[in-house]
From Swiss-Prot:
Protein name: Ribosomal protein uS12 methylthiotransferase RimO
Name of encoding gene: rimO
A Pfam match: UPF0004
GO BP annotations listed: tRNA modification
GO MF assignments: 4 iron, 4 sulfur cluster binding; aspartic acid methylthiotransferase activity; metal ion binding; protein methylthiotransferase activity
Entry keywords, A to Z: 4Fe-4S, Cytoplasm, Iron, Iron-sulfur, Metal-binding, S-adenosyl-L-methionine, Transferase
Signal sequence extent: none
Amino acid sequence: MRRNRVDVITLGCSKNLVDSEVLMRQFLSNGYTVHHDPASVCGEIVVVNTCGFIGDAQEESVNTILEMVEAKKAGRIGSLYVMGCLSERFREDLKKEIPEVDAYYGKFDWKQLISHLGKSYYAEAENRRKLTTPRHYAYLKISEGCDRSCSYCAIPIITGRHRSRPMEDLVEEVRMLVKHGTREFQLIAQDLTFYGLDLYGANRLAELTARLSDIKGVEWLRLHYAYPAQFPLDLLPVMRERPNVCKYLDMALQHISDPMLGRMRRRITKAETYELIERIRTEVPGIHLRTTLMTGHPGETERDFEELLQFVRDIRFERLGAFTYSHESGTYCDKNYQDDIPESVKQERLGELMAVQERISAAHNEAKIGSRLHVVIDRAEDGFYVGRTEYDSPEVDPEVLIPFVSGQELNPGRFYMAEVTGAEPFDLYARIVD
């Protein structure tokens, strides 16, 4: 155990990662050294920032807490604190089941944790995060919470109502990060497309995106977690006309069959979904769409699932992720539906869905062979420089693998022109041409 050291372990999504970065800055401001590597935890203070979204994430969080309890018993770490979404939802249960943890805090209880340690909370440090990502890219959380009421989702229970961050704060944070070398920003939120309604009485996502793209030094802005219902169409000209706004949109659709969209309380129809996708692709030529789909929601029939498969074949998404339904306490589903789809059927449908997408992804990537794309280098690994195009977000999307060449050194964080020389379903191979 090392004195004056804090280890923060982050589980779950990029929004959770931003929360950890805010907390780490508070520890730094109080004179601690901070670390964010779960493989080398040995601090006198350990904070596990948990995820509580679905069953698998909850299980991972509990297992991580138990691992840290064992490390504490063995004397490898000092005090152990748990915060985040799982603790927000199930704090009292966790206290009973794992009492060895020194204290449990909710998702937004940074001040209470710092106060518990007898330290000062520095409000001015809230917009000066300690980045855990490579310096050249960062996640920018533009809002917190969600006002939607999807049947399956526990996020509004955990995070509360939607709360936009003031636009001036976001502009200032990006300017500051650019000064320290950040060039790429992933705009994230539980619901990106609700931005501004609470603060300004109108959707201001297009204006925010334009203002951020005007900041000198911003190379790429990428938009994550849009909601299809009431999509702000004024965003599309901004994406089309501004070179540093990536031709990329992450918009979770979940399903396509009208009966399922109704049961999910998505407030959009099949016809409206097709129309929106056509509008986006028409107004922003070359855009890459990423979506998330779900299998096994209560009431999903074979006909519903076949409709979903056909939708994926029709639209041919450039990027797609999927997961199985998880029956979460406190949700509309929990109160109104039975979890009536066997887990084996959920998994079988998930596998079939992803097999269809793998073939589509392979075709998309093969079509890129011979093309030239701007690539940012993230790291060197196993004989390759590993990078991404504007169509690829960190961690979740394909990567570009560029073999080492004698006499050629590529720098992480630099942008290069590359020619695609080969393709796999979820990766590209390339060579530098500039």
